[in-house]
Amino acid sequence: MGRIIGIDLGTTNSCVAIMEGNTPKVIENSEGARTTPSIIAYQEDGEVLVGASAKRQAVTNPKNTLYAVKRLIGRKFTEKEVQKDINLMPYKIAAADNGDAWVEVRGNRMAPQQVSADVLRKMKKTAEDYLGETVTEAVITVPAYFNDAQRQATKDAGRIAGLDVKRIINEPTAAALAYGLDKTEKGDRKIAVFDLGGGTFDVSIIEIADVDGEKQFEVLSTNGDTFLGGEDFDQRIIDFVIAEFKKEQGVDLGKDVLALQRLKEAAEKAKIELSSSAQTDINLPYVTADASGPKHLSIKLTRAKLESLVEELIERTIAPCRTAIKDAGVNVADINDVILVGGMTRMPKVQEKVKELFGREPRKDVNPDEAVAVGAAIQGQVLSGDRKDVLLLDVTPLSLGIETLGGVMTKMITKNTTIPTKFAQTFSTADDNQPAVTIKVFQGEREIAAGNKMLGEFNLEGIPPSARGTPQIEVSFDIDANGILHVGAKDKGTGKENKITIKANSGLTEAEIQQMVKDAELNAADDKRKLDLVQAKNQADASLHSVKKSLTEYGDKLEAGEKEKIEEAIKHLEEAIKGDDKAHIEEKSTALMTISQKLGEKMYADMQAKQAAEAGAGDPGAQAAAGAQNTSNQAADDNVVDAEVKEVKKG
């Protein structure tokens, strides 16, 4: 198996890392930088520039240079955040046919996924150049507060870039992995990850625990704002400079896309400089021109002025932090460390606010630009099976279920369900007087259980003699915080139960997971055919059982010829069930039901007569009550999955 790389797909900058042994390595790009600007430029000749080269030509090509596209991914055009960006971005944002927010470049509409795929392709190439081998698998990070559409869109971007995205993980969780892996402190530690990046803000409360020599990372809570980040800080500076220049020169730079692109670059540079100095100059000669000639821009910006411009933005990070602390069920005093992630956390005022809120100095030993990519690389190593001392409480990679009648895989917990989780379903017996059931637990995506990986089996014995479909066997699946799967079966009638514990996720290598997903796709048609055949056989078996039972009770009321025809149809259907011809089974099943109509009529007439006799002449409501009771019983039966557990085979 090839390496699984870790990619931090950022709004402003992106980063790629791998693991060399147990040491993370952030890979330098072709320009020698450890981070790559998430900027993409589409040239007139069709060439696509990504990163620093795209950033350098942005001033002369503003309408075809895309940045901060991550803020559009998975969003609808009508969302207020998108509408806000339309008025700020030099490039065109358009509505797709499905209502999504797309971008328009050189007359072509493009999905944000396609644009992000160009950045991911650059990250992939950076890793391949370093490793000297093809890279096909990656763990990609997303803001913790991303919704399902945004997560799926990010995964699609990976696929477009030629990457098999093994996992989408949250940026704060990845940063916690990077921080906590080399820490030697014993006992459980709770950390807050404050992640203020280029376009999004997240805060997560995470518990790091030592469990039998493993480091366990459990996310207790998360909160954030997917439209708050460095881009907004830059915009405050741009707005300020535009206003000042208009006062001085009477010219509105906001209507000049070339000037705006230069301003964007200057604002970002000034913001960075003010993290280490008290004052900076924004100088843009020949920024524009009017009838009187060229205009030059020269403005002094102090740190104090910048802080006043962005005060409201910094304040917006506080409420999500308080909510996350509350949702985690902890007090501020319980938090051992605060980790800063994202370039904006280098701003002294942000650090000051974090210290004020959490009552402690934030840690400075985590690189805010690289920690997320490093964490993604660590998770990639865990997924590949090369690292077993780390447990990240995340999702189950494959569906979990049990084998039911006909070898069908009945899924209890579907893949990508967040763990810990619980699920229970009621099944019944397949035969009359069945004394025991065998519960076989499988993991995989195939519809037929045999195509999946069997994790274990156990018996539930001592079921009292009763007709098939009568006992109610509750099967429960429970994945706990350790990633351990507990399966139980309980007879609701007697209270008897049995349990088995399975280490669900450690039972598969990543290669097996890949193979199963591939098999599921390749064999989808074959599985569908087998599933349809099993269902036809189960339906036919139910018909046989029903007709045989009715024939025993009411057969003497039929003429000899009619009874013989039904018995002959029963034999034909029993023979058909032995084969694998679905159409033949359905044909014989239909024939049996058609020929059994006379038997049904006799049953109905007999029931009507009995009800009339019981009701009596003086109680006309009794018959209706009897009918209602029958309907109620039927409804209760409908809640039980009928005849779906095999009888245990005694050796």
Curated annotation (Swiss-Prot):
Family annotation (Pfam families): HSP70
Organism per entry: Albidiferax ferrireducens (strain ATCC BAA-621 / DSM 15236 / T118) (Rhodoferax ferrireducens)
Domain of life: Bacteria
Family label: Belongs to the heat shock protein 70 family.
Annotated stretches, region: Disordered: 608-651
Key word Phosphoprotein present: yes
Keyword Nucleotide-binding: yes
Positions carrying Phosphothreonine: 200
Example GO molecular function: ATP binding
The protein's role, per its UniProt record: Acts as a chaperone.
Protein name as annotated: Chaperone protein DnaK
Alphabetically ordered keywords of this record: ATP-binding, Chaperone, Nucleotide-binding, Phosphoprotein, Stress response
Lineage: Bacteria, Pseudomonadati, Pseudomonadota, Betaproteobacteria, Burkholderiales
Compositionally biased tracts (Low complexity): 611-636
Upregulating conditions: By stress conditions e.g. heat shock.
